[in-house]
Every structure is written in structure tokens, then in C-alpha cells.
């Protein structure tokens, strides 16, 4: 009899080990089961720990609504997420990195929570697991509180200049990119492109120009090879399950080896780029010089610099081109709007003063800026923001939220479904941003974040989009391939990216 018991125990142990091993693979039953256990097991501890802090009448509601695998849908930007979920009010929750997170859906809630966003704590590695932490865990976008303030003060200057500072080199790179992309185009040619694919590396090269200046062919090739390495290892981030725990890295020697190779080549590249920039006449214009000197002076660590550069060059570019991919679709479906925008651009060009065009691009009160904002409103790059917590207890939407409670923002509920956008809230109408003051939608329009802590590169990202849209509309007539930009079935994630992009092609007829 004891033999049968021993055999049963052995079989159970083998089954458990196999289940745990398969839990490291995304989109498997084992992964979902382990993620669920972690989620359910963590929730009571979190709320029990804060029980004494709860308001006696309006505690954070532990809603019975828990949407299975919603966190995975958020990360992968799946288009099958029911739109109705964004219309539900109240505090529903989403499994996120082992916790059930309250979701913010209204402008008043956003204002109450994000008024001190500079003091918020981001979720560890953005709930992306140990691979995410190994790549960018000490980057300026992932750290919090005093750590963030110290690093931000050092690395932000190159990315927080006036938009007008960026226009000349952004415009130069965009013209160069189109000429390299279509070298045979000599005018009068009709092009058919997929913006998310054909223009994917454009923001990458713009930021490269800002950081390193004009790279040699050898350095350019090395950077492209490093990009391939980085793309490969990033596939292992945001997999959920046991990958959320650092100890799980011992099961992945191949991934650790890939990360080691990437980090070595990435550090060597930046060291060489720094040395090359020092020998240039315009060395001070290359951001890598001031940033690398900050490391030499002990203001930031080498890891903090490498992770921040990784974040700027590899992560944010995906968001930028993901945002742009929808704009040509919307403009192609509205010939009258496109014509009006072209006239505005032509009028700005007619002023021959050197600073006139730069000021036009830098302005936020133009139809050009409104077209970009309206596209970002209807097509936020993520369904939910990264989790973060407040430093103090706070009344939010009728609930007493204890300090340290991680929350996310439902970007669709805020950008699209808020009644303040009017009866045409689901329609693409850029003029709405010209009819209201910026203050009126400060807390109901998510794009670069809220409060004191927002994306440090927003001025550069906005400049890239404005110059790119202006260049496209000024030189081409945009026409649709027949699929509507509102068709969610054509929204897919780009490769291993975590955001939605427009998959439709667009027709460009040279003017």
C-alpha cells in the first residue's frame, strides 16, 4: 500500500513541476492558473494590511467583477476587449502583476490622484517581470520618488527643451528618411505604405541624432544590430506568471546570456559614441556628452544612464510611431479636413521669416496640433496606464483610497466615453480642441500623463508627429485603401510591442 502512496506522491510532484515549468510560457493554461493563484493570494493580504486605514463608510470596493486575463489584454492591446467595459462606472478591478487594481475612469478622479504624481511610486518594473527590470528597471521612467527626482534632474535637459529647438533636425531627418525609403521617387509617383512598418524607425533615428549626432556607417550598423538584440530579449518581458519573480531567472540561462550580450554591446556602443562626440566641433549639441559626464562625475550610475538611454531610444519610439499610424487613416477619410489642414500649412509656409515655420510647429493652437490630439484621443496607445500609487490616503470618487494602493487609468473611458466630449465623442473631429481651452480637458485627456510627472520627451515626440504629418500632407494627397480607421478589427499589436497600431495601408499621391 505504501508503494502506491509513494508512487502517487511522485506522480503528483512530477505533475506540479511540469505545471510550474509550463507556467513560464505565456498564454498557456498553467500560466493562467499560476497568475490567478498569485492574484487571488495577494489581494487579501494587501487589503487586510490596510484595513485600519479604510474609511468606515466608503472603503475601496472589492468588486465581484474580475475580468479573466484582462491584464494580458491590456499589455497586448487586444482589439477584442469589449468597448462596454470602458463605460462601466465605479471601481471595477483588473488583475495586474499579482494585485487587483482600482481603475480610474473620470476626470475628477484623475485630478485628485495625479496632483502630486511626482511623488507617486511606480509598480516594480511596471509589473513586467525580471526581464523588464534587467533592461530598464533603473531608467527614469520606471523609478520613483527621491530616486526619480535625482535621475530626472540629470537626464531630462536634452528632452525638455522648447519644441522649436527640435524642429530643424527633426525636419532634416524626416526628409532624409523619405528619400532613403523611396529613392526612386522623383515626384508624380503614387506610394502605398503602411506607416507602422515603413516609418517604424523614423523616431528611432531622430532620437539617435539628438543623443549621438551624425553616426558613422560603422556605428550605424552596430546600432541596428544592437536593436535586433534588444527586440529579441524584450519578447520575454510582460509574460506574467512566475516571470514576475526575479528568482525565476535561474530557469532561463539562454535569456540571461542574451541579456549579457546586449548589455555589453550597448555599453560599449555608448562609450564609443561618447568618445566620437568629444572629437566633434558640435560636441555640446550631442546629449551623450553631458549625460556621460554626469556618470563620470558621480551624479548618476552607469546602469541608470544605460537604462534611461534604452528607454528613450527603444521604448518611446514604438509609442510615437504607434500614435502616428492612425493619423493618416483619419485624414484620408476626410478630404475636406485634409484640404483645410493643407491650406493652414501653406499659409504658415508663406511667411518667409525663418522663425515663422518653427513657431507654427511649436504651437498647440493649430489645426495640425488638433489633428494629432484628436487621433490620440480616439486611439490611445494603451488601454490602461502603468500602475502607480499615491503617497497619502485620499478621497477619490467617493472612496477612501489608502496610500500605497496601486491604480491604473482606463484611457478609453477617459479619452472617449467621458460625456464632456459631447454627443460626437466617438467621431474624429479635431476642431473640438480649438473650441475649448487646454485647461478644460487637462484631466480628461490622457496622452503624456498627468500632473508634475509626465513623459519627459513629450515635446520631442510631439515635434516628430507635427513635422511628419505636415510633411506628408504638404507633399501628398492621402487616400484610404477602403478600410475605416475606426475599424478595431484592423488594430493589432506590432510584433512584440504592447500597444495598438493601425495595420491598414495608406495611399500617398504626390502633389
Swiss-Prot record:
Residues 1-23 form the signal peptide. Pfam families: p450. Its EC number is 1.-.-.-. GO terms for biological process: mycotoxin biosynthetic process. The keyword Signal applies. The keyword Glycoprotein applies. The indole alkaloid meleagrin was shown to be a good candidate to control c-Met-dependent breast cancer proliferation, migration and invasion. GO terms for molecular function: heme binding; iron ion binding; monooxygenase activity; oxidoreductase activity, acting on paired donors, with incorporation or reduction of molecular oxygen. Glycans are attached at residues 364, 373, 383. Keywords: Glycoprotein, Heme, Iron, Metal-binding, Monooxygenase, Oxidoreductase, Signal. Heme binds at residue 455. Its cofactor is heme. Belongs to the cytochrome P450 family. Cytochrome P450 monooxygenase; part of the gene cluster that mediates the biosynthesis of the mycotoxins roquefortine C and meleagrin. The first stage is catalyzed by the dipeptide synthase roqA which condenses histidine and tryptophan to produce histidyltryptophanyldiketopiperazine (HTD). HTD is then converted to roquefortine C through two possible pathways. In the first pathway, prenyltransferase roqD transforms HTD to the intermediate roquefortine D, which is in turn converted to roquefortine C by the cytochrome P450 monooxygenase roqR. This is Cytochrome P450 monooxygenase roqR.
Amino acid at each position: 500500500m505504501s508503494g502506491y502512496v509513494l508512487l502517487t506522491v511522485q506522480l503528483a510532484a512530477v505533475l506540479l513541476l511540469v505545471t510550474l515549468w509550463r507556467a513560464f510560457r505565456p498564454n498557456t493554461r498553467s500560466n493562467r492558473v499560476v497568475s490567478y493563484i498569485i492574484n487571488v493570494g495577494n489581494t487579501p493580504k494587501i487589503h487586510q494590511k490596510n484595513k485600519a486605514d479604510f474609511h468606515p463608510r466608503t472603503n475601496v470596493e472589492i468588486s465581484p467583477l474580475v475580468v479573466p486575463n484582462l491584464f494580458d489584454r491590456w499589455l497586448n492591446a487586444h482589439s477584442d476587449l469589449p468597448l462596454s467595459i470602458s463605460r462601466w462606472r465605479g471601481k471595477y478591478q483588473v488583475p495586474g502583476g499579482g494585485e487587483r487594481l482600482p481603475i480610474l475612469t473620470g476626470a475628477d478622479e484623475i485630478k485628485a490622484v495625479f496632483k502630486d504624481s511626482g511623488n507617486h511610486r511606480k509598480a516594480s518594473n511596471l509589473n513586467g517581470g525580471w526581464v523588464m527590470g534587467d533592461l530598464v528597471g533603473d531608467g527614469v521612467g520606471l523609478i520613483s520618488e527621491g530616486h526619480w527626482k535625482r535621475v530626472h534632474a540629470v537626464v531630462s535637459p536634452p528632452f525638455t527643451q522648447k519644441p522649436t529647438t527640435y524642429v530643424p533636425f527633426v525636419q532634416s531627418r524626416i526628409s532624409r528618411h523619405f528619400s532613403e525609403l523611396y529613392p526612386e521617387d522623383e515626384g508624380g509617383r503614387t506610394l502605398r505604405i503602411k506607416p507602422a512598418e515603413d516609418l517604424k524607425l523614423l523616431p528611432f533615428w531622430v532620437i539617435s541624432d539628438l543623443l549621438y549626432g551624425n553616426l558613422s556607417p560603422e556605428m550605424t550598423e552596430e546600432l541596428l544590430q544592437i536593436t535586433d538584440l534588444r527586440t529579441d530579449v524584450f519578447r520575454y518581458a510582460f509574460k506574467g506568471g512566475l516571470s514576475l519573480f526575479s528568482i525565476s531567472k535561474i530557469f532561463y540561462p539562454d535569456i540571461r546570456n542574451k541579456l549579457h550580450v546586449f548589455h555589453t554591446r550597448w555599453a560599449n556602443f555608448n562609450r564609443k559614441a561618447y568618445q566620437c562626440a568629444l572629437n566633434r566641433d558640435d560636441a555640446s549639441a550631442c546629449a551623450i556628452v553631458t549625460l556621460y559626464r554626469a556618470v563620470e562625475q558621480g551624479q548618476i550610475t552607469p546602469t541608470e544612464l544605460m537604462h534611461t538611454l534604452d528607454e528613450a531610444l527603444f521604448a518611446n519610439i514604438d509609442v510615437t510611431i504607434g500614435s502616428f499610424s492612425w493619423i493618416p487613416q483619419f485624414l484620408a477619410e476626410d478630404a475636406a479636413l485634409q484640404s483645410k489642414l493643407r491650406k493652414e500649412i501653406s499659409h504658415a509656409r508663406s511667411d518667409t521669416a525663418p522663425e515663422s515655420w518653427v513657431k507654427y510647429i511649436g504651437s498647440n493652437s493649430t489645426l495640425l496640433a488638433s489633428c494629432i490630439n484628436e487621433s490620440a484621443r480616439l486611439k490611445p496607445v494603451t488601454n490602461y496606464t502603468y500602475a502607480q500609487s499615491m503617497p497619502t490616503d485620499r478621497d477619490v470618487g467617493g472612496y477612501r483610497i489608502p496610500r500605497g494602493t496601486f491604480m491604473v487609468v482606463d484611457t478609453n473611458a477617459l479619452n472617449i466615453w467621458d460625456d464632456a466630449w459631447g454627443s460626437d465623442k466617438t467621431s474624429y473631429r479635431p476642431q473640438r480642441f480649438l473650441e475649448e481651452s487646454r485647461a478644460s480637458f487637462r484631466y480628461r485627456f490622457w496622452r503624456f500623463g498627468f500632473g508634475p510627472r509626465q513623459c519627459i520627451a513629450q515635446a520631442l515626440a510631439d515635434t516628430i508627429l507635427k513635422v511628419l504629418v505636415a510633411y506628408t500632407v504638404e507633399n501628398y494627397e492621402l487616400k484610404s485603401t477602403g478600410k475605416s480607421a475606426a475599424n478595431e478589427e484592423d488594430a493589432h499589436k506590432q510584433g512584440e510591442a504592447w500597444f495598438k497600431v493601425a495595420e491598414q495601408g495608406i495611399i500617398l499621391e504626390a502633389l
